Structure formats: structure tokens, C-alpha cells
């Protein structure tokens, strides 16, 4: 399971000649993701750019079964 948690602090301010408004939204958050069985958990990478979190989880290739032609007589 991949668990991501953090804290958000955002302040938005609007004003003109007659009024002034400030909105603040903040709080902690947590999100969990179930990873597939073939995830390479020791190679997980994360980066944040412009407020966007990108998490990369590489996966092992699933070996496809060998296909064998069988001759049918008759």
C-alpha cells in the first residue's frame, strides 16, 4: 500500500476600494493506494512541481506463458 499524507495551507485574498476578503483553507490529508503485486516498491520515485505531486511506481514485467503449437492428427 502506498500512503500519501500532507498538510495544505492556502490563502486567497481579494480586495478592491470598498471591500477586502481573505479565505484560508488548511488541513491535513491522507490517501492510500493499493499497489499491484508486481510493483517494484524499492524503486518508487516522487516529485512535486507547481503544486502537483507525481509518484512513479515501476512494475516488473509479467512473464507471458510460452505458446506451443500442437499438431492435431486425424
Swiss-Prot record:
SUPFAM superfamilies: HSP20-like chaperones (SSF49764)
Residue ranges that the Swiss-Prot or TrEMBL entry lists as coiled coil: none
Region (Disordered), start-end ranges: 1-20
Biological processes, Gene Ontology terms: protein complex oligomerization; protein folding; response to heat; response to hydrogen peroxide; response to salt stress
Domain sHSP: 1-74
Sorted UniProt keywords: Cytoplasm, Stress response
Localisation per UniProt entry: Cytoplasm
InterPro entries: A-crystallin/Hsp20_dom, HSP20-like_chaperone, Small_HSP
Any one GO molecular function term: unfolded protein binding
Matches recorded under Pfam families: HSP20
Biased composition (Basic and acidic residues): 8-20
Gene3D superfamilies: 2.60.40.790
GO cellular component entries: cytoplasm
Subunit structure: Forms oligomeric structures.
Family: Belongs to the small heat shock protein (HSP20) family.
Protein name: Class I heat shock protein
UniProt organism field: Glycine max (Soybean)
Amino acid at each position: 500500500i502506498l500512503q500519501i499524507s500532507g498538510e495544505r495551507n492556502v490563502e486567497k485574498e481579494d480586495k478592491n476600494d470598498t471591500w477586502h476578503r481573505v479565505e484560508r483553507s488548511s488541513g491535513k490529508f491522507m490517501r492510500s493506494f493499493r499497489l499491484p503485486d508486481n510493483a517494484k516498491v524499492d524503486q518508487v520515485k516522487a516529485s512535486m512541481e507547481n503544486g502537483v505531486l507525481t509518484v512513479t511506481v515501476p512494475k516488473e514485467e509479467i512473464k507471458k506463458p510460452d505458446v506451443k503449437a500442437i499438431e492435431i492428427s486425424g
